């Protein structure tokens, strides 16, 4: 048995949810956390000093709904000089 994986790009995500809705959902997760209904693990941050870059990983889950997620964000500040975006990242959401 195989599970399917759905990959969405930025434009596809924007068609599904607005930034205003994202902010509302993030607030809701923190509200659930204050009630003990979600868990947000400590931020993992690593600075690549020799490469002038950094990486952040944020993750957590909502209890009782078998929904887990993470966001990984890389920052390459020198990309601006190359005409590239300084930030890139990925969000992953897992359910059962």
Where are these regions (language model features)?
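N-terminal ligand-binding/catalytic initiation module
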Residues: 2-96
């Amino acid at each position: 048995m195989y599970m399917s994986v759905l990959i969405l790009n930025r434009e596809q995500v924007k068609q599904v949810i607005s930034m205003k809705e994202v902010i509302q959902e993030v607030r809701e997760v923190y509200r659930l956390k204050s009630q003990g209904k979600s868990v947000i693990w400590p931020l993992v941050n690593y600075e690549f000093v020799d490469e002038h870059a950094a990486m952040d990983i944020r993750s957590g889950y909502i209890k009782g709904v078998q929904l887990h997620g993470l966001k990984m964000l890389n920052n390459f500040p020198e990309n601006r000089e190359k005409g590239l975006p300084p930030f890139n990242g990925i969000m992953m959401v897992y359910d059962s």
